[in-house]
């Protein structure tokens, strides 16, 4: 009689362990900053850097920064005069379709995958000081 009880307890403990491991949350899809860093390297770094202006402005600190405000970068009039502060929601929309957010801006680029957009924004947010 003792052996079946030990087996039941062991089986229950193993089952709970497996459920716990399988059920661990990794966060919402696309919100991982590490994944965003990879997407940024593949999709964004040709024109942008985190710390210096390239074809596009530097992006470190973009979350919470006024649009079109990086010193020394030649923004389009539309973006320079947009008058908003970048937040996560607006950056996701921007990456989805820049022209839908600010018409006639100089960046014509889209990230069609929603998880990739969210991941890039999570990465950019992680760079905010």
Report residues per predicted region.
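C-terminal capping alpha-helices of c-type cytochrome domains
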Residues: 87-129
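The canonical Cys-X-X-Cys-His
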Residues: 40-50, 120
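Gly/Gly-Pro-rich "capping" loops immediately C-terminal to redox-active cysteine motifs
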Residues: 33-37, 49, 53-87, 111
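Electrostatic cytochrome c docking/interface patches
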Residues: 22-40
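Bacterial N-terminal signal peptides that target proteins for export
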Residues: 2-13
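Hydrophobic alpha-helical membrane-insertion segments, chiefly the h-region
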Residues: 16-22
């Amino acid at each position: 009689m003792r052996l079946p009880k030990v087996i039941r307890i062991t089986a229950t403990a193993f089952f709970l362990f497996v459920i716990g491991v399988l059920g661990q949350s990794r966060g919402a899809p696309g919100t991982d900053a590490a994944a965003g860093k990879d997407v940024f390297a593949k999709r964004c770094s040709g024109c942008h850097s985190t710390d210096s202006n390239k074809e596009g402005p530097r992006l470190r600190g973009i979350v919470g920064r006024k649009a079109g405000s990086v010193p020394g970068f030649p923004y389009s009039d539309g973006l320079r005069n947009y008058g908003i502060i970048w937040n996560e929601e607006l950056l996701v929309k921007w990456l989805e379709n820049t022209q839908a957010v600010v018409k006639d801006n100089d960046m014509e680029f889209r990230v069609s995958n929603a998880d990739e957009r969210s991941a890039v924004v999570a990465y950019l947010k992680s760079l905010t000081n």
